Amino acid sequence: MGKRDRADRDKKKSRKRHYEDEEDDEEDAPGNDPQEAVPSAAGKQVDESGTKVDEYGAKDYRLQMPLKDDHTSRPLWVAPDGHIFLEAFSPVYKYAQDFLVAIAEPVCRPTHVHEYKLTAYSLYAAVSVGLQTSDITEYLRKLSKTGVPDGIMQFIKLCTVSYGKVKLVLKHNRYFVESCHPDVIQHLLQDPVIRECRLRNSEGEATELITETFTSKSAISKTAESSGGPSTSRVTDPQGKSDIPMDLFDFYEQMDKDEEEEEETQTVSFEVKQEMIEELQKRCIHLEYPLLAEYDFRNDSVNPDINIDLKPTAVLRPYQEKSLRKMFGNGRARSGVIVLPCGAGKSLVGVTAACTVRKRCLVLGNSAVSVEQWKAQFKMWSTIDDSQICRFTSDAKDKPIGCSVAISTYSMLGHTTKRSWEAERVMEWLKTQEWGLMILDEVHTIPAKMFRRVLTIVQAHCKLGLTATLVREDDKIVDLNFLIGPKLYEANWMELQNNGYIAKVQCAEVWCPMSPEFYREYVAIKTKKRILLYTMNPNKFRACQFLIKFHERRNDKIIVFADNVFALKEYAIRLNKPYIYGPTSQGERMQILQNFKHNPKINTIFISKVGDTSFDLPEANVLIQISSHGGSRRQEAQRLGRVLRAKKGMVAEEYNAFFYSLVSQDTQEMAYSTKRQRFLVDQGYSFKVITKLAGMEEEDLAFSTKEEQQQLLQKVLAATDLDAEEEVVAGEFGSRSSQASRRFGTMSSMSGADDTVYMEYHSSRSKAPSKHVHPLFKRFRK
């Protein structure tokens, strides 16, 4: 019996990923196993057996990685565990980086040495943009300072041998299974299920195999600026050519030619039944030949072209152009994800993609504010008429007659309860349309099951995901690879900053000592009120007030972020500054934001977590964070993005934007702060620790006396546990707000004077260890 219990527990642990998702409250629908949509090779890892580890945990690769004679001229170290290290000071860094971004996931990219990791998904992405198995292995051998380990070669072959060899192409509204490898087509046709999916003529005979030769050329033309190589990469030193081995030099020249030349490709294809597409995809995955979806939009004569083009004023930056060339590399549209920093112009990439495809386009954002901003971006960068844009939110439901671009939110499409009559009509219209392109903004925020629902409601030939932070605190991010497509491009934040495309930001963590009275209560209290105590720390308030005064004297525009509404109101009201949070009406929000943008007297605004992703404030150049959402790396990066937009007319200084995170010393907040910074540190940012703000004693600041601090403490202690809760943003997925909380009250409250009831808790009973707890509920016991 004990063995069976142990086996059950092991099985539950292996499935834990599908249950424990912090950002998804929905129950698993029967038959929706995510593993059905993932080839078995995707779960493979690089074999590390045989690697020696010293007493400090460092790996000793000296025997496995003998150096080449000309190793100083080659930029890569390829470790047996799949990690690749790139010397950013190498004269051939430009080419090596472009290659690594295509085949591996960036792990950490500081100034001098960058770290990447080979994964099954990154290799799938490499194959999807046209790289062959032999290309990847040959390039790695040429670039590596040492011999490439056999385990790495086997891993690359395992992950790329079958992926990308078969494509599902839509031409003239007919579906074809296409491949450059005739033997693969013959292998698939031997399977009875695939033979059943093949289209038959009126006599019941299978249609003939179609052999075609076509010339593939990118749908995005190369500009003069980017034709000499991406400006976001370092230029090769002409003096350094003599240091480059001849095989590398010849190879780089060939790479440049291959990118510029048109390529002739011979393909073999057969037509399949449209109603059996889903069954065909599942069967191909089972046979380890997952179908890569491509949309031949130029030859789609069934769906009408829409009247949309880029305005002459819309000039693409080199990295934007490069990301789109990955999407439209062979004259067709590939589905996938493009990762660009906040403020680097993701919207222009989306608008350009819509102008290239020129078919009906559906844009999905995560809030009503982002819907309005997408509409403004389409009008700013493209020639589309206002009447052709249709919004579908709870507040704005434009009539879809003659609509070419529809903009909505994930929650509107994924809504399962009863809708109004008007909303039902718009939903019916959305379902019946055949969309050429679907743009998914902030694609990392929505869990896999929500995507499945949205993707089954509307049909689109091509899906483009846009995000700045391809990270989640759970491991659901990998599901995007097969729900949308592989990662097509990821920009290097530091290079964009050095080239002036995004602001140069000074990141600082300001340590604020806890006042003795506040710290005494912090140690004694075990409830959520501890959060209020370290957020309302008087020394943190004084530091915030000092930084606001300092930057206002420089005529800077300042945003102060607070996840806690109690703290947000206290800070803003005491400092006499406007604030925006969930219940603030749309009209008041727009009024505050317009004043912040154009009124020289309004230089500081306070915003709750509603401003993390939806507010576009290019004027802001200082951000102060007084409270945050635990250790969320994503939120830290999104907030930094509020001040990342390139600054116009700023004084030429080393830094032109500032990001301050105020942290109460010796509290849980310090551990959270370290976790939050991991993503930005991996992008190459460094956080300066400030323990004392120079000139703070000379300023006239609030809470300078013990009496004032004591009054503030009493106010915090009188607050309820509900006040310590973070704000729950309407329409936010996975928000779990507790329906009840334990709090102190007066005797009149307990007798029903303010609609509360008296309850008792048995602490010993709640602390009793529970047996055989299902993994789904374990996190509630933490």
Swiss-Prot record:
Query: Where is there biased composition of kind Acidic residues?
Result: 21-30
Top enzyme category = isomerase
Q: Which residues form the Helicase ATP-binding domain?
A: 327-488
Q: How is it modified after translation?
A: Phosphorylation on Ser-751 by CK2 controls the 5'-excision activity of ERCC1-XPF endonuclease; phosphorylated protein inhibits the excision activity and thus NER. Dephosphorylation reactivates the 5'-excision step. Phosphorylation has no effect on transcription or the 3'-5' helicase activity.
List of residues binding ATP: 340-347, 642, 645
**Ranges of compositional bias, category Polar residues:** 218-236
User: Changing residue 346 to R does what?
Assistant: Dominant-negative effect on transcription and NER, induces chromatin collapse, probably has no ATPase activity. No transcriptional activity of the reconstituted TFIIH complex. TFHHI is inactive in DNA repair and in transcription
Report which reactions are catalysed by this protein: Couples ATP hydrolysis with the unwinding of duplex DNA by translocating in the 3'-5' direction; ATP + H2O = ADP + phosphate + H(+)
GO MF entries: 3'-5' DNA helicase activity; ATP binding; ATP hydrolysis activity; damaged DNA binding; DNA binding; promoter-specific chromatin binding
Q: List the disulfide bonds.
A: none
Associated disorder is: Xeroderma pigmentosum complementation group B: An autosomal recessive pigmentary skin disorder characterized by solar hypersensitivity of the skin, high predisposition for developing cancers on areas exposed to sunlight and, in some cases, neurological abnormalities. The skin develops marked freckling and other pigmentation abnormalities. Some XP-B patients present features of Cockayne syndrome, including cachectic dwarfism, pigmentary retinopathy, ataxia, decreased nerve conduction velocities. Trichothiodystrophy 2, photosensitive: A form of trichothiodystrophy, an autosomal recessive disease characterized by sulfur-deficient brittle hair and multisystem variable abnormalities. The spectrum of clinical features varies from mild disease with only hair involvement to severe disease with cutaneous, neurologic and profound developmental defects. Ichthyosis, intellectual and developmental disabilities, decreased fertility, abnormal characteristics at birth, ocular abnormalities, short stature, and infections are common manifestations.
Oligomeric state and interaction partners are given as: Component of the 7-subunit TFIIH core complex composed of XPB/ERCC3, XPD/ERCC2, GTF2H1, GTF2H2, GTF2H3, GTF2H4 and GTF2H5, which is active in NER. The core complex associates with the 3-subunit CDK-activating kinase (CAK) module composed of CCNH/cyclin H, CDK7 and MNAT1 to form the 10-subunit holoenzyme (holo-TFIIH) active in transcription. Interacts with PUF60. Interacts with ATF7IP. Interacts with KAT2A; leading to KAT2A recruitment to promoters and acetylation of histones.
Biological function: ATP-dependent 3'-5' DNA helicase/translocase. Binds dsDNA rather than ssDNA, unzipping it in a translocase rather than classical helicase activity. Component of the general transcription and DNA repair factor IIH (TFIIH) core complex. When complexed to CDK-activating kinase (CAK), involved in RNA transcription by RNA polymerase II. The ATPase activity of XPB/ERCC3, but not its helicase activity, is required for DNA opening; it may wrap around the damaged DNA wedging it open, causing localized melting that allows XPD/ERCC2 helicase to anchor.
Descriptive protein name: General transcription and DNA repair factor IIH helicase/translocase subunit XPB
